[in-house]
Regions:
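Active-site beta->alpha loop and helix N-cap motifs at the rims of alpha/beta catalytic domains
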Residues: 2-143, 153
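Gly/Ser/Thr-rich helix-start
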Residues: 9, 48-51, 80-82, 164, ...
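Structured C-terminal cap/extension of enzyme domains
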Residues: 23, 36, 197-296
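A general structural signal for well-ordered alpha-helical segments in protein cores
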Residues: 28, 60, 64, 88, ...
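Catalytic alpha/beta core domains of metabolic enzymes, predominantly
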Residues: 127-128, 141-248
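Glycine-rich phosphate-binding "P-loop"
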Residues: 137-138, 160-161, 271-272
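Short, well-ordered beta-to-alpha junction loops that form the rim of enzyme active sites
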Residues: 138, 167, 259
């Protein structure tokens, strides 16, 4: 297995829906093209931002097929994690023929596994996977945090666990991960507003929600950080910060879809149990978008 090294800006792609809540594959393909043309470093279909729990098997495979077809050799990190080993392995079997380069596997949700349970689960997934794996730690959604020591243990024991998307919001934990991570293990921010801090202290990149809206700008910030150009990175961070915060004014991806609608790229429709952005969120995102382009 070739060692994949993820760095820079990876966009967690939204899934556009039509007014009658069907997947808008045309808008999705255009969105993927926009990402590629804007210089993002890798793409992440079928994750949280893509409303993947609401998608059918056919929709998932078609979205991944379209993505692979349009990105050439750009790395694709596809979401496949569930809260059971069998469910995650079944997703891998379903999706692998459609060209992912690696899997994004979330810490199992609802079950609230212990650190030992998390370790055994990810080790079992890694042993059965033919592709590299990136752990996704997002305790605000799963109810269980993966501690730095568990992630390091997995990185050392499982050669095909190549990184972690860290969305715990705990900089002390992420800093420990960065300090102890083995060479070639990517620590990626799962929170746009923490990207500057993480990359400035040795993290490799971000899996971004905001880059759906501003792919060139978020990619440029990551490029600057990879070159240790903190002055440029700080300027971009401060320009983008209202967008970073606004994207979480309501549950992701509700606000980012409102922003994409403002740009005319897709509708703001989301599938139940999510509901469309409130009037105040639409107003907020409209202002953020207008101000962002004014400040260019």
């Amino acid at each position: 297995m070739n060692r994949l090294y993820l760095k820079g800006c990876g966009t967690a792609l939204v899934t556009p829906f039509t007014d009658d809540y069907k997947v808008d594959y045309k808008a999705y393909a255009a969105s993927v093209d926009r990402q590629v043309e804007s210089g993002v470093h890798f793409l992440v279909p079928l994750a949280t931002t893509g409303e993947t729990p609401t998608l059918s098997a056919r929709e998932k495979t078609e979205l991944l097929r379209i993505t692979r077809e349009r990105v050439g050799g750009m790395p694709l990190l596809a979401g496949c994690g569930t809260n059971s080993l069998d469910g995650t392995l079944a997703n891998m079997e379903l999706l692998e023929p459609f060209g992912p380069d690696a899997w994004l596997v979330v810490v199992p949700y609802y079950n609230k596994p212990t650190q030992e349970g998390q370790y055994r689960y990810f080790r079992a997934v890694a042993e059965r996977s033919t592709l590299p794996i990136v752990i996704y730690n997002v305790p605000g959604r799963t109810g269980a945090n993966m501690e730095a020591s568990t992630a390091i243990r997995l990185a050392e024991d499982c050669p095909n666990i190549i990184g972690i998307k860290e969305a715990s919001g705990r900089y002390d934990q992420v800093s420990e991960l960065i300090r102890r991570a083995p060479e070639g293990f990517s620590v990626l921010s799962g929170d746009d507003d923490m990207t500057l801090a993480l990359m400035a202290t040795g993290g490799q990149g971000v899996i971004s929600v905001a880059s759906n809206v501003a792919p060139a700008e978020v990619s440029a910030m990551c490029d600057a950080l990879l070159k240790d150009d903190l002055k440029t990175a700080r300027t971009l961070h401060h320009r983008l910060f209202p967008l970073f915060k606004g994207c979480f004014a309501e549950s992701n991806p509700v606000p980012v879809k409102a922003a994409m609608a403002r740009l005319g790229l897709m509708t703001g429709k989301v599938r139940l149990p999510l509901s469309e952005a409130t009037a105040s969120t639409v107003e907020l995102m409209n202002k953020i978008i207008d101000d962002l382009w004014k400040s260019a």
